[in-house]
Amino acid sequence: MAVAKQVDFDVVIAGGGLVGLSLAAVLGKAEFKVAVLETRKADFDWPQDSIDLRVYAVTRASQALFMGVGAWSAMQTRAAPFGEMRVWDAGGNGDIHFDSAELGEPYLGHILESRVIEKALLEVVAELPSVSLLCPARVNAFELRGDRQHIELQDGRSLAAKLLVGADGKDSAVRGHAGIHARASDYGQQALVATVRTQHPHAETAWQRFLPTGPLAFLPLFDGRSSIVWSADSDLARRLMELDDADFCAALGEAFEYRLGEVLDCSERRLFPLRRQYAERYVAPRLALVGDASHVVHPLAGQGVNLGLKDVSELAATLLQARDRQRDIGALLVLRRYERARKGDNLAMMWVMDGFKQLFGSRVAPLCWARNLGLNLVDAAPALKNQIMRAAMGL
């Protein structure tokens, strides 16, 4: 990684989280001159027996990106593969079972901690001579002048770039400074996350039960424990947080129908508010948005981070093609190719997740009957089920 003395870059990435570091790694491998701006220094000094409460279901497509930049090997020891997924409805007998063996594949994906991914990516980026990491650094303002974005940092430093990328999350300062409006709506729900130990092993299976108040997921971890994500109406989520550990474990086991036996113990619990949000535009002259800066979806299908990594792959491919054709990587016509490729896909996933939330949150009898019938029909249709699995795996 270069010492951050140069002030003129091909690409400046605001945001050194998972998505921003992934983009920096891909572009750095292709010898673009890149600066990554991150507001806080990451703390990767954690006890080895601790588990990050933020975990992601990493698809095969996202895994391929990590392998391509050389980061996967550092993640692998704490990656939990899952070959099966079981989904069922609390309001009836609807049940569906996905099994990677039906596709001749060893697994559907991996569950990985956020900090494990970020640490591996940071180690890759640190070895790339064309990438500079500025930390702490925060964008104060930027202005388009000629063929550069001129970026002023809060500490007074100035940078210039052919392209500024906002990878700075759902409250993106880059998006705000660019005047790009984001439409947001609150789901009225919160996701309660924790790490739990169960009586029976998770068997490398991801589990999800649709409750009237929101979905409950058990995700397998590398050490035999499970990460749980319980999306619930805000009042219920707060009541669950107020329970002591024993009562919470009992409530969790009951809500999960004891599919893995008793819940024996749990870690600390945290709440994250749920909302959906999408930027009206992904690009402007010499500016692009990726990841949560451009779209936030319900975690129901665990696709949020994978959508962000699809953004990374598409934007990197767009910039590489432009460079190969000797075109300006910051030109709006070039960047609109990226927007066309990703905006429709992200919006489609958002509306699908909204539809699932409405469908499985309904207690209206005809809808309950229809969704249970639908789950069972899909489970009995191998061709359709295999198509769903391939799409979810990113194949």
Map each language-model feature to its residues:
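N-terminal glycine-rich dinucleotide-binding loop that anchors FAD/FMN and/or NAD(P) in oxidoreductases
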Residues: I51-Q76
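C-terminal helical "tail/cap" subdomain of flavin- and related membrane-associated enzymes
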Residues: A317-L395
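Conserved N-terminal helical subregion
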Residues: K5-D8, M67, R78-H177, S185-Q190
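Central beta-strand plus flanking loop segment that forms part of the substrate or channel wall
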Residues: A61, D171-A206, F222-S226, D233-L236, ...
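Glycine-rich FAD pyrophosphate-binding loop
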Residues: G28-I51
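Short FAD-binding loop at a beta-strand-to-alpha-helix junction that anchors the flavin cofactor
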Residues: V283-P299
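N-terminal Rossmann-like FAD-binding beta1-loop-alpha1 element of flavoenzymes
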Residues: D10-V36
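Conserved FAD/dinucleotide-binding core of flavoprotein oxidoreductases
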Residues: L211-P273
